[in-house]
Amino acid sequence: MVSIYVPLIYITILMGSMYGVSRFVRKSKNQESKPVSEEWFGENYSRNIFFSLLQQNPPAEDTLLKAALVLRATEGLRRLMKLKVSRMALNNLLNRGGVGDELIRKFGRLEKETELELMDIAKTANSLQPGWNQFIFQTCNEIIENEKIHSIIDNIPKDIDSISQRWQTEKILYEAADEELRIQAQKELGVL
């Protein structure tokens, strides 16, 4: 009687473990099909806006499509710049053994996705206006630089307040030290 239960328990455990492994494999495959750029950077709203404008019925105006494409290209360039900075840090971590192969593979996929995105932007720009693919990235780079300058300018008033306070404290300390030196010099001369 005991001998009949042992094979049944064995088969049940075997089938359960096979089911668990197959479920794990299917789940991991579903996660890999998701674009890596969404995991890394979040959703690309400018790309979504551009594609929604393309699919509008009646079609959107060319100027609106071009503006949306410039926004999409600007976001693509921002992501590319972040990837370049991250690549250097990732290489340092890789040399030290601080990251695994999975992260390296994901980062490689992310770089390829970004390159494909930029190539698609260039093709789309050329289809909207022939020859525009050569100038769109220059325009986007200027937009990014302009945003950097504006962020620096926006931080200037905050810096002015802190610099002004520091200057006032240093001025008081300097005047006190100067007064002390003046008194000491007068004592040495015998004036006091």
Swiss-Prot record:
One of its GO terms (biological process) is post-translational protein targeting to membrane, translocation. One of its GO terms (cellular component) is Sec62/Sec63 complex. The chain crosses the membrane at residues 4-21. Residues 22-192 are cytoplasmic. Its main location: endoplasmic reticulum. The modification Phosphoserine is found at residue 162. It is a single-pass type II membrane protein. The keyword Transport applies. It holds the Pfam family Sec66. Keywords: Endoplasmic reticulum, Membrane, Phosphoprotein, Protein transport, Signal-anchor, Transmembrane, Transmembrane helix, Transport. Residues 1-3 are lumenal. It is found in: Endoplasmic reticulum membrane. InterPro entries: Sec66. Acts as a component of the Sec62/63 complex which is involved in SRP-independent post-translational translocation across the endoplasmic reticulum (ER) and functions together with the Sec61 complex and bip1 in a channel-forming translocon complex. A cycle of assembly and disassembly of Sec62/63 complex from sec61 may govern the activity of the translocon. sec66 is required to attach or retain sec72 in the sec63 complex. Component of the heterotetrameric Sec62/63complex composed of sec62, sec63, sec66 and sec72. The Sec62/63 complex associates with the Sec61 complex to form the Sec complex. This is Translocation protein sec66. It comes from Schizosaccharomyces pombe (strain 972 / ATCC 24843) (Fission yeast). The gene is sec66.
